[in-house]
Each structure stands twice: as C-alpha cells, then as structure tokens.
C-alpha cells in the first residue's frame, strides 16, 4: 500500500497555473526525486504537500488517511492543517535555523512545543524534557555533529547547518522527509557531506521526496524520479528509465544539459 497518494493537484497564483493535474504515489521506504528546470513547480509541489500552500484542486492521502480534499472545507481548517503537517518533515535549502538557539536547541524546539499540548506535560515536564534532549543528541550524533551540538548556527559551516536542519526535521518522526534543493546553498565540498547523510537515510529506508539538481545523486539514490516541466509531470518512473531511456523529447533536452556539461 502506498504511504503517499497525490491525485489531480492544481495550484494557481493569480492568473499563473503553477501546478497542473499532478498525480503520483510513493511506497513506504522509497526515495522520490523531483527534477526539472527552475520554475517548473517542484518547490510549490513540496510546499503543497507540507501544507505551506493550499492546492486549489486535488486530494492528498498519507497511510490511506485523507489529509486534504480541495472539495472538502473541513480538511482546509487551520487546526486540522497543523496536525497534518506532522506527517511531513521539510528541510529548506537555506537551512532556516533559529540563530538564537544552539544546534541542540534547534533540534529540540518543535518537539518541546508539541509536548506542551500533552495533558500530562506539567506532571512529567522534567522527564519529557530529558527524553526530548536524549533523542535530539542521538540525531545530532547520527549527523556527525555530537561535538557541535552546543554551537550556534553562526559558528557552523553551511554543511553543518544543513545537517542540523535534517536532524530537526527527523525529530518529529515524520512519515515522509522532504528536501527542497538541500545542497543549492553549499559549495561542492560541503555538498558531498550533506548528500552522504541523505544517502545514509535512504539506506535506512527513510521515505523521502527530494527536489534536486544533482542528477548523478538522484539517479543513484532514487527509487522513482519525476520530471516536471511547466507545472506538469512530464515523465515518471524508475531512475534507469527516466535517465537512460526517457520517452519525452523535453526530458532528453533537460538531461542533455547535465550529461554534456
């Protein structure tokens, strides 16, 4: 059974149709890469999945649960949307860490805010805090940052900041982890360390959706690739099909820019 089902998503900004009848599915443990030129709708699609934008049409299901139906006003209530965001974790290309918190504090923050809504929070405050701190330290250690957890973002390299952002997204145990061009703000040396972390998550069967311009990485790490053009999914399939035997001329044109430099 698919962990994610997206059906006929449309999104318009003003008179510009940014997403046009987007449909795809993803199995648990799979990695999906979204590729395509800048402005093709990839980031908007991620933002719709994370409920940072509201689709004008379409349906989104996670674990066979209806999260969003544009025809059903109940699924568009802000109180419901806040809960549904927890199904997804989003790692931004520009990190978006809070500068006033350490690496550890950034990873703990969302989980602590969520814990305050628990009915037993006041009675178990110290215990809950200790549990959240231990999990945050484990995640930072997994990211290779155990010696940097008390550093502030301005004391970290771009690659380290991005790894903190990944740990922060993982802290809420999302069903699906999303990346929006996670290496676009990094130099080539730091790009490699972040891609290594993402590859490690893939090896652990973490379900992920990755917007990327790193074609070699997408080919290597993905179970499925979607090529988007002008707001539409023009081609989708296993990486060996999309990269080696694309059916659409537009896909071939796009990929030739990378293979030919």
Predicted regions and their residues:
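Helix N-cap at the start of a conserved alpha-helix in ABC-type nucleotide-binding domains
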Residues: 188-190
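A short, proline-enriched helix->beta-strand linker immediately N-terminal to the Walker B motif
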Residues: 171-175
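Conserved ABC ATPase signature
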Residues: 152-156, 160
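ABC ATPase "signature
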Residues: 236-237
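Catalytic Walker B motif of ABC-type/P-loop ATPase nucleotide-binding domains
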Residues: 177-180
């Amino acid at each position: 059974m698919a962990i994610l089902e997206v059906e006929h998503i449309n999104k318009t900004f003003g008179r510009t149709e940014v997403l046009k009848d987007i449909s795809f599915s993803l199995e648990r443990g799979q990695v999906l890469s979204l590729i395509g030129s800048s402005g093709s709708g990839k980031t908007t699609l991620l933002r719709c999945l994370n409920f940072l934008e509201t689709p004008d049409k379409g349906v989104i299901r996670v674990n066979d649960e209806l999260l969003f139906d544009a025809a059903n006003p109940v699924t568009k209530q802000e109180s419901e949307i806040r809960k549904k965001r927890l199904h997804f974790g989003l790692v931004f290309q520009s990190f978006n860490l809070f500068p006033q918190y350490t690496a550890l504090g950034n990873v703990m923050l969302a989980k602590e805010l969520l814990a305050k809504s628990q009915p037993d929070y006041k009675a178990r405050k110290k215990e809950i805090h200790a549990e959240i701190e231990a999990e945050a330290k484990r995640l930072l250690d997994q990211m290779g940052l155990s010696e940097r957890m008390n550093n502030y973002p301005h004391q970290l390299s771009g690659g380290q900041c991005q790894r903190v952002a990944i740990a922060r997204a993982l802290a809420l145990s999302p069903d699906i982890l999303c990346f929006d061009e996670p290496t676009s703000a990094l130099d080539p040396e730091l790009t490699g360390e972040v891609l290594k972390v993402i590859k490690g998550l893939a090896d652990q069967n973490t379900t992920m959706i990755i917007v990327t311009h790193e074609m070699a990485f997408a080919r290597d790490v993905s179970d499925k690739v979607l090529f988007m053009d002008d707001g539409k999914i023009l081609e989708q399939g296993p990486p060996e099909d999309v990269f080696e035997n694309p059916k659409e001329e537009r896909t071939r044109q796009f990929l030739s820019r990378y293979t030919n430099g």
